Amino acid sequence: MKKALLILTVLVAILAIAGCAKPAAKADSMVVKFGVFEPLTGANAAGGAEELDGIRLAQELYPTVTVGGKEYKIELAIADNKSDKVEAANAGQRLVDSDKVQLVLGSWGSGLSMAAGPIFKDAKIPAIGLSCTNPLVTKDNDFYFRVCFLDPFQGTVMANYAFKEVKAKKAVIIREVSNDYSVGLAKFFVDSFKALTGDDKAILAELNYNTNDQDFSAQLTQVKSLKPDVIFAPGNYTESALIIKQARELGITAPFLGGDTWEIAEFINVGKQAVEGAVMSAFFDNDAPLTPLSKVFVDAYQKKYGKLPSGTAVLGFDGYLLAIDAIKRADSIDPLKIRDAIAVTKGFAGAAGYVTLDANGDPIKSAVIKEVKGGKFVYKTTINP
């Protein structure tokens, strides 16, 4: 009798354990992982943090996605690419091999995106670039897409501003030669500015510096002697602010123009009064809503973070929502099916405008021009493609 009772007790215990284990296994299986591939340390950390803020807000507002009538929780697997191309490749590999994500969001910084692009392609994991504007990010990679405008358009926009608004006929370029984004955007500006002026010698000089440089006296001494009408310096926010600050200290008064990477609070924090009047292209303006979701995003961002969002933050938000939209259209969490759904995106309404992707995985979007006034980024105009 005692033996039978003991056997019965053991069986009950086994069944109880099995019964507890089943729901846990089910819960684990009802998850879809979004890899967040961003520079959270290093020279580009402020940009990566802005995009991550947008992604986290989107996750807070939309924490699940329904597939096949079942609700899946969305988890973020965050990989810091450390603002370094080698580390970017390592971070991308971790997302694929260790985190086993269904898709990837990021990165701030075109060179970082390009470093991990082949890894995502080989693993057949779709990636949605947020603010990586260099055309090479998606070129020959049918697993990389994006929600931002491209540098050929951005460079043309700023060249037109220099020619038509500044009335410039001669320009100097100061580029971050170790940065793919800076080199690429500088080239598109140069080509467009020469065409606009009709002068092959409209660019007086193309001067170089490296990421993390602090002293720009050699380049700026040359700029001062050339007396350009305008200076285009499409580099990282920190170095660009230092360049402008040191230029003003040398008595250089020519206006400075830059790209989307300037619209980060750190640009004003570093440059202070010296960057007043600096003009840049940007992705979004809080006072110029483009879709019904624009105001939803701005209000929610202010409530969560206690400040107005940047253009890079809104792209983090939109990238997350595009991923959800693609999963719903695919009705699957299989990466290949998600990729196929992203590729045929048409008229997706994000907070930063509508997204229709072309054969390269790129959208056609407007650019905003902003100017630093009173220590803030102030809207000037919107330029349509």
Task: Provide a role label for each language-model segment.
Residues M1-K33, V67-G68, N384-P385:
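Short, low-complexity disordered leader/linker segments with a strong preference
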Residues Y144-L207, T211, V230, A323:
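An alpha-beta-alpha
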